[in-house]
């Protein structure tokens, strides 16, 4: 376990193994625990694995401010730089995919490869230029209201509804427990960043190899949006996992790990 100080905010990094570096960045509300199986699989295959808890998440600090994509990406880049990894494949899930995408665009010397998991990278809501997902206004207001009225219930609904099939209640309880480490002020700020950030202009700046892994029935980020992004990136490979929702690392771990290992060992 390590902590990296970024302008007075401690960012938690679980740093295990030796070899080429793979950094894992979780999505909204989740943290290093999400990747437990993948940490074991990757370290057994000879990789150094860094699970980075974003500010407001996991064991990282939870300041009142600083949850815009630029700040979160800067946290990630600073952590990788301070740990002197030389370069890493960065794997970003959902909201973490947007953060990883911005980091790849701004620090290609540190982000040498990019994996987007259940994430379209550039947007999480519909716009004229990106006609996928829901319009941001009503969705954002609904999420903010739910978080304000019943934080615990809101986290349960958000997590349960993201699976392709009814999940094991024990899995949901575990993910909600992780999610509740994130205080409401961080959640509200991250929802705003998630649904209002547009990274389409970064597409031209992402020159690294990119792997996209998405569940074919992901109810959060559509496979159509992932296909659109693949066509616009310079060097992208898309893996669609059948009958899988928003959590490929949990719902289809064998297929997920096979795709990831093929990419990082190529």
Q: Where do the PLM segments sit?
A:
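Short beta-strand/loop motif that positions the catalytic acidic residue
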Residues: 206, 212-214
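Catalytic active-site module of serine/aspartate enzymes centered on a nucleophile-bearing elbow/loop
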Residues: 236-266
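Active-site loop/oxyanion-hole signature of alpha/beta-hydrolase fold enzymes
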Residues: 39-40, 44, 50-95, 258
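Alpha/beta-hydrolase fold catalytic core
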Residues: 1-23, 44-47, 85-86, 112, ...
């Amino acid at each position: 376990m390590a902590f990296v100080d970024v302008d007075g905010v401690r960012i938690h990094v679980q740093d295990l193994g030796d070899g080429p570096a793979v950094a894992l960045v979780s999505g909204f509300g989740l943290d290093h625990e999400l990747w437990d199986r993948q940490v074991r699989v990757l370290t057994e295959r000879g990789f150094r694995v860094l699970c980075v808890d974003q500010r407001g998440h996991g064991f990282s600090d939870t300041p009142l401010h600083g949850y815009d994509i630029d700040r979160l990406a800067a946290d990630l880049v600073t952590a990788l730089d301070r740990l002197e990894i030389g370069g890493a494949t960065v794997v970003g899930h959902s909201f973490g995919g947007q953060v990883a995408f911005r980091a790849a665009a701004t620090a290609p010397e540190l982000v040498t490869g990019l994996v987007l998991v259940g994430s379209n990278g550039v947007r999480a809501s519909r716009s004229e230029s990106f006609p996928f997902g829901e319009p941001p206004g009503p969705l954002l207001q609904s999420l903010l209201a739910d978080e304000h009225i019943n934080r615990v219930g809101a986290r349960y609904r958000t997590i349960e509804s993201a699976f392709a099939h009814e999940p094991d209640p024990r899995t949901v309880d575990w993910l909600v427990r992780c999610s509740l480490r994130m205080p409401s002020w961080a959640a509200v700020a991250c929802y705003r960043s998630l649904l209002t950030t547009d990274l389409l202009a970064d597409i031209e700046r992402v020159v690294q190899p990119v792997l996209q892994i998405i569940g074919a029935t992901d109810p959060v980020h559509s496979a159509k949006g992932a296909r659109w992004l693949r066509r616009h990136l310079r060097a992208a490979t898309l893996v669609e996992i059948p009958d899988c929702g928003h959590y490929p690392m949990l719902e289809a771990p064998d297929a997920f790990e096979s795709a990831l290992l093929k990419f990082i060992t190529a």
